[in-house]
Amino acid sequence: MPKVIAHIAASASFFALVLLLSVPHAWGQTSAGSVSAVNGTVSVERAGKSTPAADGTAVQVGDKFTTGPNSRLTIKLSDGSQLELNESSTLVLTQDTLNPDGSRANTKVTLLGGLVRSLVHFNPAGAPNFEVHTPNAVASARGTMFDVSYHEGQPPPANP
């Protein structure tokens, strides 16, 4: 009887490993891109620990970036899209998934304050879903450049 239980446990472990390895590449993705430029004071908070951001820093889902006054940050995502965070801004990368061919499937960021410029890479094989969330709105784009700003307690700017 103990040999049967050991055999069942070994088989279950093997099938669990096969299942984990068969999950699409996007699940196992460890880096969504990297920091390509830092000007001034910029921090990245990961797993509750804040450190200064530097050129080449890997960007992961859940990372929270904060720029100080007169500071800027540029993040290059793995598909070539770019995020440019303006001074006194805070941004969280909340989702980043890729298609099996490595093209972007879904990216979501949350702008908690300040301004972000998004340069979204166009993929002719299938446009990615790229969203910028703020506490009161969502902007979505596929293959374009756009700015989103959010300043708590301030009315949105008037359209010209």
What residues fall within each predicted segment?
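Bacterial N-terminal signal peptides
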Residues: 10-22
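N-terminal secretory signal peptides that target proteins for export/translocation
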Residues: 1-7
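Intrinsic disorder/low-complexity signal
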Residues: 8-11, 62
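Flexible, surface-exposed loop/linker segments and immediately adjacent secondary-structure boundaries
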Residues: 28-160
